[in-house]
Amino acid sequence: MKKLQDAFSERPIEPIEVEPSILRRWTRRDLLLFGAGALATLAVGGSQLPREMWQRMGLDPGGTSGPENKWLLNQALRLDDDVSAALYSQHHLVPTYTQSQITPLKNNYNGATPDPAYIPGWHLILDGLSSGLVISLDIEALRARHGIHDRITRLVCVEGWSAIAWWSGFRFDDLLHAYPPVSQAKWAHLESSVNLDANGNPDPYFVSLDLLTALHPQTLLATHLNGKPLTVEHGAPLRLIVPVKLGLKNIKAITRITFTKDEPPDYWAQRGYSRYDGI
């Protein structure tokens, strides 16, 4: 191992040239898996790298759970986010399905299912608007103004499962045109004040969503699942369906949307997970 480390640290790094035609054949998933996988592999075996390499990065190796591994895993998450964002296109559509292909969709609240008592008095609060107003809308007003659009798409969970479901609702794009955000807004901060933790205590959930993704033609603010109004288990009366993102971005029981110029906080990003979560 000592000889290998010495050879590795002393050997000059030569540039690798890749033909542009080869890069063009790579899919986004190829790039993500290659980059994130390389960094994750380095994190797992990082303790075997020469100490001077860690020192050049301002780190001090301390074993498989040391700071260098956390640093590398964070870099892998950042690469995932950055590549996903860079390759995003509104022209990239996820596959759609027929009603015969619909599969069961489980209740996947991270904590306890909220008490349905919130539904009768539910309103959606809109903030960060160009008008300077803070607007409160009930579900009937939203349905009447924006009409109904249907999408049968796959919901993909970061835990490894997926389900095909028929969602109905109005496009996020329509909401943005009806209630324009403040000038130079780039983000939407979506909140659910009714979310609970595993013990049934209040645990507000919130996600950050870039407005380019909000404008994607398949992004819905859904009110129905498989032809019926949303139940509490699936985010009644209004939830986000954004099939180009992982399930954790598809926030249930939305109570507030705020448009911002700067990237807002995100529940899982604050807990060490990625923030973009593109598919």
Kindly give the residue locations of the regions a language model identified.
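Intrinsically disordered, low-complexity segments enriched in polar/charged residues with Gly/Pro
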Residues: 11-12, 18, 110-113, 129, ...
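Generic secondary-structure transition motif, activating predominantly at the C-termini of alpha-helices
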Residues: 8-12, 146-147, 180, 225
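Near-N-terminal "mature-domain entry" segment
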Residues: 19-27, 32-35, 40-178, 252-265, ...
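Intrinsically disordered, low-complexity segments enriched in small/polar residues
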Residues: 7-8, 43-44, 109, 198, ...
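Mature-region segments of soluble proteins
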Residues: 150-152, 170-279
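Generic N-terminal simple sequence motifs
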Residues: 8-11, 46, 91, 239
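N-terminal secretory signal peptides
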Residues: 1-26
